[in-house]
Structure formats: structure tokens, C-alpha cells
Amino acid sequence: MTARKPTKPNLRPVRELTPTLQYRTIHGYRRAFRIAGSGPAILLIHGIGDNSTTWSSVQSTLAQRFTVIAPDLLGHGKSDKPRADYSVAAYANGMRDLLSVPDIERVTVIGHSLGGGVAMQFAYQFPQLVDRLILVGAGGVTKDVNFALRIASLPMGSEALALLRLPLVLPALQVFGRVAGAAIGSTGLGRDLPEMLRILEDLPEPTASSAFARTLRA
């Protein structure tokens, strides 16, 4: 009897959906968010000093099965950066208002860093809107705070961030980061350094650094 050849599985290519950037004006402030996919809703909330692009690859993958919304928090990314309330409660209210735009009734909330704190506050304030809560290195769960963030939150932190607008300061920090990263890469600070430098690259704009400092103090 001739042995039957194993059949090859019918593999289909994985389809990625590219998020589209949209804007909505809510309570007088322009909010930016990226949305992709269809199906049950997922809300991705980024960390302090970051923006929605940090979720790009995750959002495209999840969008194959879900409606995935990744906002730029107020004071971050392409959203407005006013002199406003940057507390987690205010951010949670902003997330509720943003979800009302596409008329989403319930959502799985995923938060990283500050976004984790916002996600927890959102679940506390609006439990009727939350299906699941997922935290990734969430702020407010432990007392650990990045050393650089501690410095930036001090009274002179805003002045220190303003130095990023001077010529050659940011390039010098980037060179220092590469050298220091090689030397202390196995330590907690070494692991955080590349992420911190990536965030600092977005802060030379005066409104961005001011919003960053206000968020830290909130």
C-alpha cells in the first residue's frame, strides 16, 4: 500500500490593517487618535511622554479581529497641549468622551505606564463601559518611578526640559545614551534609557515640554 503523503495545511496570509489618524474636538480641545479594524472594541492608552504610535504593530495585529482605538492623550502626540487638568481622572473623562464619538458602549482597556493608571481610573469611574482591564507596567501599581522622571518632576524640572531646545543638547544626550547604555545596559536605568531618550526627542517643542511637566506633577 502506498503511503499517503501528508497534506499541506491551507495557510492564509495574515492581514494587517493600517491605523488611520483622525481628529475630534472635544470640550474645545482637539484630540488625535488612531483607529483600525472592526468588531469588539479595544482601547490602547500609552504612557507619559509617549503617543499612540507606540502601539502601531500591536494595533495592526489586533485590528484583524477588533475595533482598536489608540488615542494621543491630551498634552501628547498630535493632540492639543493646553494649560489644563492632566490628572488621571481628567484623562479618564477624556477617554469616555472620545469613545462616545464612534458610539462605543463597552471596551477592553489596555494601558501602559501612565496609561495603566488612566485605565484603572477609567474602570473605577465607568465600570459599565469596561469589559476587561489589562495593565502593562502600569503607573500607580508600585512605588517605582524612573529616575529621570523624578528629576523632571522637581521644581526646576521645566527649566531642565527647556534646555532640550538649545542647539546640540539633544544630540549630545543621544550620544551619551548610546555610550551609557553599553556600560549600564543590564541595570534598571540602562534598560529604561533608550525609552527615555525616545520620549525626550519629542519634547523640544515648548508646548510639549510644558504639558509633559504638568502631567508629571499631576
Give the positions of each predicted feature.
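Alpha/beta-hydrolase fold catalytic core
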Residues: 1-42, 63-66, 93, 97, ...
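Active-site loop/oxyanion-hole signature of alpha/beta-hydrolase fold enzymes
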Residues: 24-36, 70-114, 126
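Conserved HGGG/HGGXW glycine-rich cap/lid loop of the alpha/beta-hydrolase fold
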Residues: 29-78
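Glycine-rich His-Gly loop
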Residues: 44-47, 113, 138
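Conserved catalytic-core motifs of eukaryotic protein kinase domains, centered on the activation segment
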Residues: 54-56, 79-85, 144-147
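Short, hydrophobic alpha-helix immediately C-terminal to the catalytic nucleophile
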Residues: 56, 96, 120-124
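Flexible "cap/lid" loop of the alpha/beta hydrolase fold
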Residues: 120, 124-125, 131-167
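Conserved alpha/beta-hydrolase catalytic His-Asp/Glu region
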Residues: 135, 146-149, 165-218
